[in-house]
Amino acid sequence: MRISRSIGRLAMCLVMVAVVGAGAVGAGAMTGPGRDSPRTDAASRASSALVAELALARAATVKYVSNLQLAKANGYGIITQMIPNMGYHYMNAGVKGFDVRKPPILVYEHQGTTWQLGAIEWVFTSKPATPPLPGARYGAFGAGCHYKDGTFVPAETQDACPKTDPQSGAAFNFWHPNLVTLHVWLWYPNPSGLFASTNPLVAAFNHG
């Protein structure tokens, strides 16, 4: 997989399509000739707000698109191996709260010696009362134990975590409860949608 500007442009085009499509919901309702309904106005404002947020996110993460080493140097460490149709997850444990310019998790695709940033991600212990991004869609990740090499063992409590991964022997890193996830496919086109948890276009990289 060769990183190219065309992939970035295509991803941004699909992001814009997703944003415009979301903003078009309810646009057919009119309160009178030539007058948009309140629903249309609200959708338009939401679309504009999302475009602005995504622009901030892209500006902040462009340095990581093909530079995993920089991400590591800036505190992102591996927390999963390749999750099919998703990617390798790298987390910066020092990033707290929601700031679109500072995603705590970067999701990479890998082939050969090349790494491509596909998505950025946030996790929550419960679904946010107010979506942090307009139109946000959520996924889920079950409770489990993470190990230093990115391997993962499902476990309902930290006490149930083996001290080392049963298969790789890697040392225990951390445990987390059931989580609500928010993916944003900012750097790789995703026909399933900007906020989809998985991406069929990265299936080719499921085996690294």
Where are the predicted features?
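Bacterial N-terminal signal peptides that target proteins for export
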Residues: 2-11
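Bacterial N-terminal signal peptides
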Residues: 11-23
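Intrinsically disordered, low-complexity regions of eukaryotic proteins
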Residues: 22-25, 38
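Sec-dependent signal peptide cleavage junction
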Residues: 24-33
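Primary mode marks residue(s) on the alpha4-beta5-alpha5 output face of response regulator receiver
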Residues: 32-208
